[in-house]
Amino acid sequence: MNDFSFQFSRLADLVNANCSEILIVGGKVSLSRLNEAIVFEVSRRKTLRRLFDSTGNTGQENRHTISPQIGVIEQEVSSHAEAELRALLVANIWENSVPVHRMHGIKAFCIAFRNLTVLQFVTSHLLSDARAGYELTADVVDSYNKLADGMELQAANIESWNGDLELRLSSLDHIRYFSIAAIRILRDFVTFERGTTMSKFVPSARDILKHVFARNTLALVLRKRMELGVTLHPILLTAAVKAWAIHKFGRDKIEGSYRIADMYSFRRYASSDIQNAYDTMVMPFFPRIKLREDVTQTVLQLQRALDKEKHGRIFAELYRQRLYRIANQVLPKNFAIQLALRCIAKTELIITNAGTIELGHTRFGNVEIVDFFSFPQLFPPGRMMIIFNTFADELRATIVYDAQRFARSEIIKLVELMEQELQLIGDDSCRQIGAAIAANDPAEPQPRH
């Protein structure tokens, strides 16, 4: 086995190991295991350096030696995992515990980007060899296949987390897309016939490797999480929506400067810097429906659309009474008039979907919530979107708004009013709303498989 084959085989062994393996005890993250994982990852980095440095210079020119690229592996693979673990440790101390579903989301997030980093390294090396006229040996092909097998296993693990926890974090679909893309590119590289040019593989590789979500957004997420100590939920939601919009519409079709704010973040951080973490170009991609003018039919159609898309339920009366009153207090009167149901019924609504919630997080106070619930966009498309869901045993409201149309002070006021209104929701009123909905549509929502 030549030097490169040996090194790459060892590299595949190291990378396929789970860099962010953490023991979850009783639904919480073990602080001692977090520390152990950090120490282990630092040791892994040293092992990588010793491995490649020891075989990098033998006195003879070996163009297959990959020791010059060890900086890529060390900085982009290991440091990402270490940064994730340290951020988790900080979050654990700050919040006393990290919910299981958040841990799985962060873990999947880390694995997906490690896959992309390895893919970038492999692609660069293969292109360099192809230009130099080298052919892939059987040993090297075996190593590439071994690495691709590891990526497939990791992608399968993400699928199993989704099924076991009945969890659909906004990021998981996109993470799965990247993992599958990485596998496809690797398979393409190792199965081409000898003498075939590499050009047909280059565009697909570049499209993935230069994707904004794979590079810029990751740096933003890691940097801002470390600086501000913010939770992953709102930032990852922003990044996922942004990336999915680019994937669906193309970069040129994204317009408007959109930001995400949620009352949980504003309540914990009275700092103007918090908005910088959410400052990104976002154009949400959600299904749209055309509503009828009849009020009763509109409410029923809206409820059926939500049930069909998310297998959830909508508190129609809460939607009409509470949130419209909030909007009337904080927004100009002429704009608030446009929010009347008779006007909204004549235009398109974007149906929001914050994703399902983990089993065990289905209660708001003493009120049990079936699956999860969201509200349609209160404002004309492109202006504002309010997403309701439950997160970590509390009701969460996330606002996606156009920074060019709304002042930050208005959004903060809106968040405060929403929080006050939501605290006024009693058991009796919720039961009455639930009974009204059940009377209109008695069928229970079917769980997503």
Where are these regions (language model features)?
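Structured interaction and signal-relay segments at domain junctions
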Residues: 62-75
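Hydrophobic/aromatic-lined pockets within catalytic cores
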Residues: 128, 141-148, 226, 240-249, ...
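Acyl-thioester-dependent acyl-group transfer interface
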Residues: 1-59, 81-106, 246-449
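Short amphipathic alpha-helical segments
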Residues: 232-241
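Non-catalytic, low-complexity flexible loops and terminal extensions
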Residues: 1-10, 127, 131, 135, ...
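Alpha-helical hinge/cap motifs
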Residues: 125, 225-232
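A generic structural signal for well-ordered alpha-helical segments
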Residues: 41-42, 225, 236
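Histidine-centered acyl-transfer/condensation active-site motif
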Residues: 86-87, 99-147, 157-168, 389-406, ...
